Amino acid sequence: MARDYQVRKYIADNAAKYDDSRLTKVLVKAFDLICSNEEPNGCMSSSVALHVILRSLGYEPKLCYGLCVTPLGNEIYHAWLELNGEALDIAIYGNSHFSPFWNDAQLLPVVFENYNNTAIRYRDHVFDEDWKNCMISQAVNMGSIANYIAKAPHAQHPSGNGIWKLIFSILDETYTRSKQESLQRFVSKEAFQCQEQ
């Protein structure tokens, strides 16, 4: 898929408030990977990967998840990040552009936006009776980010752990065991948690 330079610019412009080229680079790279893979269901894996990366850059993101409401009123279980009280959701672009099940408006990534200004109504820790059946619930039931990285279905891929591969792809770095161990300290024993909106 061709790169969407307007969306890349939008991400870079919104990330500029942090005046951190490393942050801008990883957000644009995460977007590029979602587009090149035409990833429709990557909200948890993308959010976890960016959570690890942002912590390694010195930020304190929160990993959020819950039942969100789309512009046309459809409900979806979704995962995203929050940084300094603002939503960060690169994966919503993939959900809205590549999923055959998406029956709503195509959305831009949400990059450091106030919750009141987003097209999606994010509802952290809001669940319905079908929560236990959704893929995000299965990830949360693994207990911690470290367990999710180690035990998620894509973690057992023959060519290596999928989440670590995603992290290194977003960082645009070659995988090394020592670098993984360095990054691992940002996720070990960190439980899935979020504050209610």
Map each language-model feature to its residues.
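A structural boundary/capping signal
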Residues: 1-197
